[in-house]
Amino acid sequence: MKTVIMTSHRSLTKIPLMMDGKMNKSEENVGTLPLPTLKRLGFLPEDFDGSKYTSQSWTNYINSIGMGKALYVQTLAEPIIQQLNHEAIILDYKKWATIGMKPWLNARQLVLSKIQEHLGIGMYSAREDDQIVEHARRKGVRIPSLNFQWLIEHRNDAPIIKLLLQKKNLDMKIFQWSKLSKFQNRDGEVSLSGAWNGYSSYSGRFTARNLAMAALPKEMRQCYRAPRVRGKPGVYLSLDANQIELRLLAGAAQATRLLGQFQNGIDIHKYFTSRLLGIPEREVTDTERKLGKSLVYAFLYGAGKSKLDKIITKSNMRIIQAPSELLTTLYPQLMSLVDSFRDGNVLYYALQPTNVEPRIGPTWMQSSSKQNLPVQSATSMLMKQVMTQINDKVKVVNVIHDEFICLCCFDEVDEIKAIIQDGFVQATRSLGMALPASNLLEATILGGYA
């Protein structure tokens, strides 16, 4: 093994490169991966100059730090992800402008009316941010900045600040998604597509630039217009993997109670919330369940006590036990695994330990990132492996974190769901993961079909 000193702008980083290693199954494809992807797979800083190193060097280094499986999955998935650059979701823009955006337009009108009433001004003034600021000043409320961050931080200082923030949020959404009008074809259709990055973060998530396909508004889904498929009416089919992070953690930790709950179709968030609030499960409301779900995922993604306290305070609900204590009581094996991520001396990726310290170049990771990355990366790797399993059977047009959006015939919905369900089972087995697969996929037809 040869130690090579690689220089970044910030520091010298010692990287062990097995320069005399033999070519393995990743070597023949690693050269096709973009350099930023290789750097992220190697947990190297973005400004690291890796252009002078060979594919063999990259392969050996990434294998040596325990990221060989991630590299192999990425080499298989990268061309499939890049195929998404040539796929699109068809939007009926007229329907979107008249029906889809209507809830936003109605909400904006309501906010403007409240601003009028609160400040005693006309509709013209209520539409103008500067006028709102001036009239608020006359009533003793100073708003020195229209910056979103300032408004968010001070939204509870005065009702008019919260109303102004709501107005600006709605203005931004309406403006952003109205711009699609210029992309209509003669049939009033807009093709929604993005430029995909197969490894956009250190967790391995793949995302679309230009148009953020993962951020398409839910209100838009009723306005999609699927083309015909093999002469039959087509549909866009959403297949969402329910609670994939919790499932992967339950499998990795062999969390007995949690595995049983998934197997039996128990509503885990309602179960947790009932014990958090000290009420029967049947009495848990949707709002209360939402609090429980927010706390579970905030904790699993690395939130500390102060963040959890803020979520609870904002809800105005009374809890009888701290969320972290309750999770430890209910799911001790899962919490033990999460603690190993947070407290370990090495970085975990896809729920398994690597051979590297938890840092990117000279910058050490915060505890929350050490806890978050193993879960996020496991989901990303599994979704990529599923794509390789189903690529020749299913036409995927978009991927949103743990959700596949596919184009298929209207009478193929059950068949496509079964194929993707089997894809998860096969992918889990290939990666050596454990995933409770009962009630895994939720199928939804998006919009209508031609």
Spans of features found by a protein language model:
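Short, amphipathic alpha-helical "recognition" segments used to contact nucleic acids or chromatin
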Residues: 291-301
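Short glycine/threonine-rich loop-to-helix capping motif typified by GTGT followed
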Residues: 105, 407-415, 448-450
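Short secondary-structure junctions
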Residues: 390-395, 429-435
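Acidic, glycine-rich two-metal-ion catalytic cores of nucleic acid-processing enzymes
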Residues: 2, 11-15, 19-20, 24-25, ...
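Short cationic amphipathic helices and targeting signals
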Residues: 306-308, 402-407
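Extended, well-ordered alpha-helical scaffold/bundle regions in very large, multi-domain proteins
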Residues: 69-160, 301-338
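Short proline/glycine- and acidic-rich turn/helix-capping motifs at secondary-structure junctions
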Residues: 430-450
